[in-house]
């Protein structure tokens, strides 16, 4: 085993019909409710800012974002009506990203998920940790910044300027991670510092080459990816 996750996509493995039955997730443990819910939020946000977004994917992505923000906390705390709505939200997010594709949050989650001896970083947990840092990185691109601000504005978050709206969006994600008991940094998750330093250069190379990187709204080099991972490990500001 290489310790590397590879995303696979092909029409030969695409189902003709999806049965979206909320009864299937009634018994889901709270931790998995949190991780899969934040994965759905990441799917929707990345689809909305993707270079391949369009008029067919934008409404699906925005509706999914709104539903996750509205229903995930209650679903996490055991409300079955909210869990049903989350089940629909993840489907809408899936429809959005299946057509608009994703970005480097997923690239990074794919390539760190099985990389460390500490244990597997569950995909949704990784996405939740990485998302606010990637928003900060991508928001240095004017088009991406406008899209993130649009999300915040439509979700009724505070702010007038784009910068203030983006701050509110990141703060909302941080707030949700706190409520869902998701770590804010890789260090807090428990990744050992010496192993992180040893592996992060090669992980960064792999992440840049991931299939999801091509539709990210801002280009990234292996050196920039390594800097971004360092911000996520130590919880430092993304200022580049």
Regions inferred by a protein language model and the residue ranges of each:
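Short alpha-helical scaffolding segments that buttress acidic/His motifs in well-ordered protein cores
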Residues: 41-45, 86-94, 108, 131, ...
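Glycine-rich phosphate/pyrophosphate-binding beta-alpha loops
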Residues: 91-127, 210-215
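Short, amphipathic C-terminal "tail helix"
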Residues: 195-240
